[in-house]
């Protein structure tokens, strides 16, 4: 079934094209027009010389504030941007509220789940970033011109090199987990530079060099379980880590794909939806049965090396973008029961359960690589669209950007 799309607000043509410096120029012009020459300026990068800027600017991640009033985006131009959802209703263009740059490529980052520009305290308005050849760092989203608030020791004592975290997840207000090479997971306090503990899976030589690629995520960016964590690796393995014993337990190895990139929990916590690279299938695992695979969801395309990120909400269920500019969905009722019908049946040909709903977004020349749904306006989502960064420069116009809109879903009409 296909659904209509309501009008939204987006970055228009700011991120279009294949020249990073021109993107910054267009963004500056949009900022000046919005602020009417107030004298305020967006932060500019201090490292433009000697870089290869003939490429598109692609969003790597999107985070909503807890009150739905703003979003934070991480882009591959080393930039971190904040956008405030307009309350005036007289503009359809997203212009950054703030923009800051790192000196190195951002491998991964994570905004504090309690972040909001309307917080009474700045303690939660922070972002963790992991970059190449740098320690893990915490930055303020309130004072984007300020220095690093804290840095965390991720150095390998054997080699003397920084180990790059590939996954970050907040456990509670003051603690977070990082995952890196050799199946290594560490728990940090925000206020200590060294880890509280470090755990490492030892499943023999075949997995000794696995990279922890993702942690399980609760809906709406809630804090993860304080007692245990599920993490995935680029070796297609899932592990359960008990925080009390710090001993990981092997759960499952998938035969399809080339590494887990996202693990989404259902609201009731009974099912885990596991996304992987280089496959068109999403694994469905039953958490009550030692994470036994019980079903699969079939995507209308095969995910490549460019990550696609989905989200789960109580209104729209599981939503994910496609490589031809659409959004596909499985209803919340289906997601809460593993997309298994009332008779306990699943798709019997091994192809996976097809989407129940498709949203036409009018972005046929671009792929929608991120869909993040608002934690307060349950039908509203922020999405990122871009060309495939793994291909050579196309002849057609490359369309990239951020778009915020409402997905109108009438599941009862299906």
Curated annotation (Swiss-Prot):
Compartments (UniProt record): Nucleus
Family label: Belongs to the SWT21 family.
Organism superkingdom: Eukaryota
Entry keyword Lipoprotein: no
Subunit (UniProt): Associates with snRNPs.
Species per Swiss-Prot/TrEMBL record: Zygosaccharomyces rouxii (strain ATCC 2623 / CBS 732 / NBRC 1130 / NCYC 568 / NRRL Y-229)
Single GO BP term: mRNA processing
Chain's role: Involved in mRNA splicing. Helps to stabilize the U1 snRNP-5' splice site interaction.
GO cellular component: nucleus
PANTHER family recorded: TELOMERASE CAJAL BODY PROTEIN 1 (PTHR13211:SF0)
Keywords, in A-Z order: mRNA processing, mRNA splicing, Nucleus
Protein's name according to its UniProt entry: Protein SWT21
